[in-house]
């Protein structure tokens, strides 16, 4: 975590001692967590990830293959088929035609899961991210097109407002702060629209409290009982997000503002376990730690 400018680990501690003590502590935390979590029907439906062959492949335990790989794809409403992202050489924003060609190439390589992230034109952004609720936006069009052309592909859709807001935050601003409960209502609307457009998996990345339960409730009430929720359960306020924010076009809107009031403090491991346990109880089928590489202790826990 020194890459996150961490200064909370005393230099006199040896790496070996930290690793040894952490291993025992993590095991204890894990066993406590298992007994803490209470998964109940209908928020939890264990058949959900068994409902389709490609979902069973994605969540198969003790089996490592291309079925475990998910390819992020950035899309934009643009005339050019591909536009390279400056901060990520070799990675492109695609229009719909290029998206379909890229997906076909991935299928030929054995990769059957794609995660769609939009770059939205500045003139379509506003305070509440209203374009996220337009059923003709680029994400909804992409999901429908992928479902028609590649029914065997798992389509993962990001649930968050930051690509659509003119301030770059993941929710509604009230007196300069992101209002949690107003944002939940908008995330419900966005999630339902994405499910109606053909998303197999919804991935809320916003880090609002209670978002998983809110999304699960709206899905259940509209008979989308098999739509999987992949929660960004432990999403840290990380320095690593710069290239991604450039890719979706939110960095200019966010400017020097911080997301630390809703994304997690990188010093906290116990909090990650609480966040994960809560999301599972609220109805998440899959959970994620983000970033991953620099947070392997959190993944291990």
Stretches with model-predicted labels:
Residues 25-35:
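Short, Lys/Arg-enriched N-terminal segments with co-localized hydrophobic residues
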Residues 77-301:
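Alpha/beta enzyme core
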């Amino acid at each position: 975590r020194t890459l996150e400018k961490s200064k909370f680990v005393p230099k006199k501690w040896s790496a070996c001692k930290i690793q040894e003590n952490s291993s025992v502590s993590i095991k204890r935390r894990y066993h406590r967590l298992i007994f803490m979590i209470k998964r109940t029907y209908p928020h939890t439906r264990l058949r959900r990830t068994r409902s389709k062959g490609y979902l069973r492949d994605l969540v198969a335990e003790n089996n490592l293959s291309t079925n475990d790989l998910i390819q992020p794809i950035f899309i934009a409403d643009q005339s050019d088929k591909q536009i390279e992202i400056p901060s990520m050489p070799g990675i492109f924003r695609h229009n719909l035609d290029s998206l379909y060609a890229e997906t076909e190439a991935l299928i030929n390589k054995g990769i059957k899961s794609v995660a769609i992230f939009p770059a939205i034109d500045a003139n379509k952004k506003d305070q509440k991210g209203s374009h996220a609720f337009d059923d003709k936006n680029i994400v909804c069009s992409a999901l429908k097109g992928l479902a028609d052309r590649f029914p065997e592909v798992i389509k993962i859709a990001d649930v968050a407002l930051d690509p659509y807001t003119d301030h770059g935050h993941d929710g509604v601003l009230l007196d300069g702060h992101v209002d949690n409960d107003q944002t939940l209502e908008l995330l419900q609307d966005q999630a339902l629209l994405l499910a109606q457009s053909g998303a197999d998996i919804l991935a809320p990345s916003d880090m609002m409290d209670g978002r998983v339960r809110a999304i699960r409730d709206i899905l259940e009430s509209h008979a989308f009982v098999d739509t999987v929720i992949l929660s960004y359960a432990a999403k840290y306020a990380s320095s690593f997000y710069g290239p991604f924010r450039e890719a979706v076009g939110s960095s200019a809107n966010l400017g020097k503002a911080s997301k630390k009031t809703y994304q997690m403090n990188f010093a906290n491991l116990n909090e990650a376990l609480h966040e994960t346990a809560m999301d599972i109880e609220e109805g998440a089928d899959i959970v994620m730690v983000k970033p991953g590489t620099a947070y392997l202790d959190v993944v291990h826990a």
